[in-house]
């Protein structure tokens, strides 16, 4: 279902834990990390689609989250031709999205990447709120920045300022090869003897899963699964 401009209606989900970190998933059998998202089916409202995608991709049910906010308008991004199925080229242009900010009310072990027979992710982790802007595939970076910026006003004030602190430290973080991020992940996530949720595995530093530096992100390997959701 496309609009007259070739954009597919879609929802994006920013899921927060109690530390105001965001859920970050690795697309199955690829090196690509992203927020949960998915298309709006005919007859669905954006909120209905959001709850469906939340269960399909993360395994959560409506009582396990609290809806904090959503973006006011559609946010659009265009998908490069190399990521579009050949039979859709020429009329499919990209996604237009309503983004939701959710608070997890349960626990990490409530997340289940195998809630359906068609999983979207094969690994996940919690990231600081602004980290996805550093590592998401380039053609999504603009819409991620718009969504994160619009919804950041619902975070505690110090979390909003962290965006600018990260911007100033970005060069030094890359020069240190992600060691600070790895240490932060180890201290917050992978506790000794911790039992992972069903279908979950942790990549301690998804920034280092990308085989190219940040400036070379457009040359990321093409996912085997066409990016049409």
Swiss-Prot record:
E.C. designation(s): 3.6.1.-
Domain of life assignment: Bacteria
Residue span of motif Nudix box: 38-59
Ranges for domain Nudix hydrolase: 6-149
Molecular functions per Gene Ontology: pyrophosphatase activity
Pfam families for the chain: NUDIX
Required cofactor(s): a divalent metal cation
Biased composition (Pro residues): 220-229
CDD domains (UniProt xref): NUDIX_Ap4A_hydrolase_plant_like
Region listing for Disordered, in residue ranges: 191-229
Entry-linked InterPro entries: Nudix_hydrolase (IPR020476), NUDIX_hydrolase-like_dom_sf (IPR015797), NUDIX_hydrolase_CS (IPR020084), NUDIX_hydrolase_dom (IPR000086), RppH (IPR022927)
Keywords: Hydrolase
HAMAP family according to UniProt: Nudix_RppH
Main function: Accelerates the degradation of transcripts by removing pyrophosphate from the 5'-end of triphosphorylated RNA, leading to a more labile monophosphorylated state that can stimulate subsequent ribonuclease cleavage.
Similarity comment: Belongs to the Nudix hydrolase family. RppH subfamily.
NCBIfam families, alphabetized: PRK00714.1-2 (NF001935), PRK00714.1-4 (NF001937), PRK00714.1-5 (NF001938)
Name recorded for this polypeptide: RNA pyrophosphohydrolase
Biological source species: Acidovorax ebreus (strain TPSY)
Lineage of the species this protein comes from: Bacteria, Pseudomonadati, Pseudomonadota, Betaproteobacteria, Burkholderiales
């Amino acid at each position: 279902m496309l609009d007259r401009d070739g954009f597919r209606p879609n929802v994006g989900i920013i899921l927060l834990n109690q530390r105001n970190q965001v859920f970050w998933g690795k697309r199955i059998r690829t090196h690509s990390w992203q927020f949960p998202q998915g298309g709006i089916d005919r007859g669905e409202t954006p909120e209905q689609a959001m709850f469906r995608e939340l269960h399909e991709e993360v395994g959560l049910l409506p009582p396990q989250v609290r809806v904090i906010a959503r973006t006011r308008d559609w946010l659009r991004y265009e998908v490069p031709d190399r990521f579009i199925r050949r039979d859709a080229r020429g009329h499919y242009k990209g996604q237009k999205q309503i983004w939701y900010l959710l608070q997890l009310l349960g626990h990490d072990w409530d997340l289940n990447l195998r809630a359906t027979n068609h999983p979207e992710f094969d690994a996940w982790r919690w990231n600081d709120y602004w980290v996805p802007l550093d590592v998401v595939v380039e053609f999504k970076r603009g819409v991620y920045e718009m969504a994160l910026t619009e919804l950041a006003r619902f975070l505690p004030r110090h979390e909003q300022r962290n965006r600018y602190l990260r911007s100033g430290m970005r060069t030094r973080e890359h020069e240190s090869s992600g060691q600070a991020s790895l240490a932060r992940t180890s201290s917050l996530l992978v506790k000794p003897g911790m039992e992972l949720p069903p279908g979950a595995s942790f990549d301690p530093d998804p920034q280092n899963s990308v085989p190219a530096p940040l400036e070379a992100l457009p040359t990321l390997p093409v996912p085997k699964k066409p990016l049409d959701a």
